[in-house]
Amino acid sequence: MEEKPSGPIPDMLATAEPSSSETDKEVLSPAVPAAAPSSSMSEEPGPEQAATPPVWERGGAGGMQQGSSPAPDSCQPGPGPSPGLTSIVSGTSEDLRPPRRRPPPGKQIPCSSPGCCLSFPSVRDLAQHLRTHCPPTQSLEGKLFRCSALSCTETFPSMQELVAHSKLHYKPNRYFKCENCLLRFRTHRSLFKHLHVCAEHAQSPAPPPPPALDREPPAPERPPEVDPASAPGLPFPLLEPFTTPAPAPTGPFLPYLNPAPFGLSPPRLRPFLAAAPGPPASSAAVWKKSQGAGSSPRRPQGGSDAPSGACR
């Protein structure tokens, strides 16, 4: 018996090879037209080539332009804007717009006046309603305006006439006048300061005028002059305080008071002078006499060389 080869049958191999070659041709066929544009791109285009319109192949459903790679229909943009871009632009434009102040349809706008519960569908109706709450300022029929000034009983039918009349009572003054003494001041503050002083003077009674003197007042008696030599106990009699009483006042003014009775400088000097030992009161005269004798060119009798001021 002949052994059958374990390998494949040659007829089956022959049939299998054409199928594989066909698939290779189908795969390589699209690459052939793709290589053509590369060769055409290497050549310099002439004027005739630039003028010729593009040639479309008839193969395929829609055809394909010669020298261009196939592209899906979804990737080719149309002449108008794409729907995705329009949605983005519309979204940004709506965000940039200011919010609408108009209320949505069907919403009622309530009245803001206290005690009013009415609401209106539009702003115009609300504005017309607000006029009933705030009427324009005008004089009411039959109402009279009275002047508020004291001792004035004038009445006027309108507010404008009352304001014009009030200028007569309260005219703008450039100064402030005191009613008591009729003094004028530039500021209101200075007038208030003056009113305190003016009120005190008005309350205090005026001093009576001094009586007229028919005769001349007597001359004040002078104290007897004391001889300074008759008071040996006082070394400085001029520093002794003045003990004579002052004359009685003859008018409304206070008399002049001697400052010596108040015990200023003379009482302070007295104990110091009394405690200090010193020469008697006649020592000053003796010293002047001896000084005058020493200055003379004559010498004392006896011819002694002792100084003239020495004690014998």
Curated annotation (Swiss-Prot):
GO molecular function, one term: DNA binding
Regions of compositional bias (Basic and acidic residues) in chain numbering: 213-225
Coarse class of the protein's main subcellular location: nucleus
Cellular component annotations (GO), alphabetically ordered: nucleus
Matches recorded under Gene3D superfamilies: Classic Zinc Finger
Zinc finger annotations (C2H2-type) as residue ranges: 109-133, 145-169, 176-201
Compositional bias (Polar residues): 84-93
Subcellular location: Nucleus
PROSITE patterns: ZINC_FINGER_C2H2_1 (PS00028), ZINC_FINGER_C2H2_2 (PS50157)
Domain of life (superkingdom): Eukaryota
Keyword tags: DNA-binding, Metal-binding, Nucleus, Repeat, Transcription, Transcription regulation, Zinc, Zinc-finger
Function comment: May be involved in transcriptional regulation.
Family to which this protein belongs: Belongs to the krueppel C2H2-type zinc-finger protein family.
Protein name as annotated: Zinc finger protein 414
Lineage: Eukaryota, Metazoa, Chordata, Craniata, Vertebrata
Gene: ZNF414
